[in-house]
Amino acid sequence: MARRPFAIVILAALGFMRPALAADPIRIMILDGQSGGPYHAWRLTTQVLKKELEEAGLFQVEVVTAPESGGNFAGFKPDFAKYQAVVLNYDAPDWPPDLQASFEQYVKNGGGVVSVHAADNAFPNWRAFNTMIGVGGWRGRTENAGPHWFYRDGALVSDTAPGAAGSHGARLPFQVTVRNAEHPITKGLPKVWMHAGDELYANLRGPGQNMTVLATAYSDPSNHGSGRDEPMLMVLSYGKGRVFHTTLGHDVPALSCVGFMTTFQRGTEWAATGKVMQPIPASFPTANTVSYRVDVAAMDPAFKNGPR
């Protein structure tokens, strides 16, 4: 499949001043502290995610950093109930049972969850977590984690064939297709929009319970893809809790895409409150135009020429 030509719109910081904080802000925790490897620079991406939420003027954001795997979790007991949603910029192999139980109870009681990119690599053996996020990849996941999920002929389907979970090609721009235009997160978005260069996750596996796919992207075999329309944005329910799962956002240039920023801000608001009041910015990407914030991309010290 030939790659589509596209344009890039570079947006300067002008006009993106942070608005005054709402009188009753939405309380958000960003949880970080570990990644499966150095390729996910969580210390850097957490600062970008925090900036993007604070720019919306709706959120009061606190970063909570967990001990690294194998560290001392005895004193790590976050008060999840203080927050309306927890943003996971975090990929760890396991948690102590009491911490798992605390988080499960938080979500069952109505706490929101936002899973960003490699957060869906975490906790392969924690059944409740995998039910919360719907699908995940890597860290030894196989068919035991659940089927592959993807779109075919306009419908969500599953494939129980054996095999590993999780793959991606090179970080290239790709089109995102909205599959549910009536959900509060995606309502008003273009049917198709171009995302900046990013890892396009494919072949994820999981239980897929109570999962609605909001948007997909075609995983092109010419870039080591699956040849399927893979889930990019999903929403789920777990008890009374709402979960927004985005597979986008590998690095700072990908996070600087206005498409990522907008869906992340709106998805976090929905996970926390069940509604979305934020407008779609005029700078949102089109079907053939990548739109990104140069000031955000420049938060990466390696940034030189912008997103791919």
Predicted regions and their residues:
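Extracellular ligand-binding/catalytic regions of CAZymes and related secreted enzymes
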Residues: 23-26, 43, 55-56, 78, ...
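Structural detector of well-ordered beta-strand residues that form the stable sheet scaffold
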Residues: 112-114, 214, 244
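Bacterial N-terminal signal peptides
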Residues: 5-18
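N-terminal secretory signal peptides that target proteins for export/translocation
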Residues: 1-3
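A glycine-rich, often tryptophan-bearing local segment used as a flexible ligand/cofactor-contacting loop or short
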Residues: 93-184
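Short, solvent-exposed loop/turn segments at secondary-structure junctions
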Residues: 35-36, 93, 120-122, 191, ...
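Helical hinge/lid and interdomain linker segments adjacent to catalytic or ligand-binding clefts
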Residues: 27-123
